[in-house]
Amino acid sequence: MPREVPLERIRNIGIIAHIDAGKTTTTERILFYTGRTYKLGEVHEGTAVMDWMEQERERGITITAAATTAEWTVEGVPYRINIIDTPGHVDFTAEVERSLRVLDGGVVVFDAVAGVEPQSETVWRQADKYHVPRICFVNKMDRIGANFERTVEMIRERLGAKPVPIQFPIGSEDRFRGIVDLITNKAVLYVDDQGKREELDAIPTEIADEVERLRNEMIEAIAETDDELMLLYLEGEELSVEELRRALRKATIKGQLVPVLCGAALRNKGVQRLLDAIVHYLPSPVDIPPVRGTRPGQVAGDDGVEMITRPTSEDAPFTGLVFKIVSDPFVGKLAYFRVYSGKLETGSYVLNSTRNQRERIGRLLQMHANHREEIKEVYAGDIAAMVGPKQSYTGDTICDPNDPIVLESIRFPEPVIQLAIEPKTKADQDKMAVALSKLAEEDPTFRVFTDQETGQTIIAGMGELHLEVIVDRMRREYKVEANQGKPQVAYRESITVPADVDSKFVRQTGGKGQYGHVKLQVEPLERGKGFEFINAIVGGVIPREYIPAVEAGVKEAMASGVIAGYPVVDLKVTLYDGSYHEVDSSEMAFKIAASMGLKEAVRKGRPILLEPVMKVEIVTPEDFLGTVLGDINSRRGHVEGMEARGNAQVIRAYVPLASMFGYTTDLRSATQGRATSSMEFAYYQPLPEALAKEIVEKRRG
């Protein structure tokens, strides 16, 4: 069966933004206009289609990225838009990160009142990292304090982008009644409540001068990206709508310009024009560079490793990337994946090249938030879900077994907060283990491990809300009741000076003994660099087959910690010498020798504890500024900058996570509920010595 929609007419887009900018509402409106839903869903009523987990409907936020397919017709031509709705809450950045990896373009939604908020900056940086072309939608134009020009200015200043407004609002706040389309130079007024009826009208005289200025600026910005248009423009020629659209599309895909639109999704204003803009300016799978990868077992960037490219075409061998695992109450495990090349039919086999496992494709589904449609095959450019994968996890490559390739995986931040959790009853015990392992499969930033010293089960994640949602899902979806401890900071250990160690593990009991001997040089790496292992053995003083055991021993010792039982990070370990015994040496002996060696090296290397520091943004009325600043200082924080926003002050600061637990509640009571704050992980920094001493003593009991 040939594909229904040609590749050029497919758009894989994400709707990304700060929490509460109105992203899910915008997606809901898109689904309504593209005929996928017949009744409008509202987040604040708890009926939004894309928010299908109970927690999302209760909290009014989006936690998981639901993928859905919609159809939209522009000038008589049908297009298919695959939409991924992503969460805006900072505790769920993993969801945003993994969606961006498989998208071709993004719609970034801003709140016209608040403008660019901290999470908008985070999301923007994530989109930059994956070179995702984007358009901006300034939402909530009907709210008191809405300001389109200020938001555009903030996009320019705080995000360092080159925004080009291609629309201008007619009226704002409760008088927002339409937009001027600067490309066609026509006014569009909304006549009915559902925004389905538009009337074209003359541009209102009170904004005519402003519109003319903005239109000229827009034409100039577009012409600057295209030499042919620049010549026509300089010669005073009138540029046609087609020429402007074509050049703006090119510039958007290259990342030179960012078109900006406006509207009020909740009032159904501006969403159809946004759909047109998705088609006009965002790339199809054909417009982006072909995906690149390596052969299994090779590492990109190593000497002599050639990169393989896969063209976006169904004639190429099949290549896909799994970007999300979901435990579905009806069909079990679902793996969402993006097809980069080739095609895939149900009943066929693929190779999971990341894990070197074959996987049979049972059923394929195309998703519409939470109802699904069975399909027989998927093609290059599609996003679909397979049912019941045995071996595939987030970030894995699936490909044609006869032509294997491994794509770059998705990298996720390490968890910064942890808490102990225990089942309430004996019956909950086994159920809890199953629930936690399923939840960890779905979410790569959520970890579960057992504390070696206390035997407690510890869960770790990106923030208090993240862990709260996990415990909540355990209760609802898996019917597990659990008691939880207080949130704890996920400290790390590291060293400050290099250390050399000579470590021997020898055991002689009757019969075969044990013998492992390694010499290690251990050096500190800069923050965030993780772990590097270098094998510098020459002349076979340690046989090659024991080297992986040495690395495993080092990693094991690092994971369990040395001075206070926290994982050791940012180390470079070089194995440069050692010896072995013909009979007594074994992998186990070398593993133990390496593990003992690493622990000794950390003790010698002037060890320190590292603590996570959060980037905090607080919006407070002027009257409480002194109180809020004093409070930040008392929490060992330092203020990086302040700016006025309307009659409020915005404070940006860095504060250690250890002193931020329950901060939102404290802030509310200190400011009579008038200040708001948001925070996200920034970096790890050394803990002051007195505090470190206290923690080490406490851990050692």
UniProtKB/Swiss-Prot annotation:
A Pfam family hit: GTP_EFTU
Coiled coil, from the record: none
Molecular function as annotated in GO: GTP binding; GTPase activity; translation elongation factor activity
CC per GO annotation: cytoplasm
Subcellular localization: Cytoplasm
Sites where the protein binds GTP: 17-24, 85-89, 139-142
Keyword list, A-Z: Cytoplasm, Elongation factor, GTP-binding, Nucleotide-binding, Protein biosynthesis
Keyword Phosphoprotein attached: no
Domain spans labelled tr-type G: 8-286
UniProt keyword DNA-binding, yes or no: no
GO biological process: ribosome disassembly
Chief location bin: cytoplasm
HAMAP family: EF_G_EF_2_B (MF_00054_B)
Annotated function: Catalyzes the GTP-dependent ribosomal translocation step during translation elongation. During this step, the ribosome changes from the pre-translocational (PRE) to the post-translocational (POST) state as the newly formed A-site-bound peptidyl-tRNA and P-site-bound deacylated tRNA move to the P and E sites, respectively. Catalyzes the coordinated movement of the two tRNA molecules, the mRNA and conformational changes in the ribosome.
Protein name: Elongation factor G
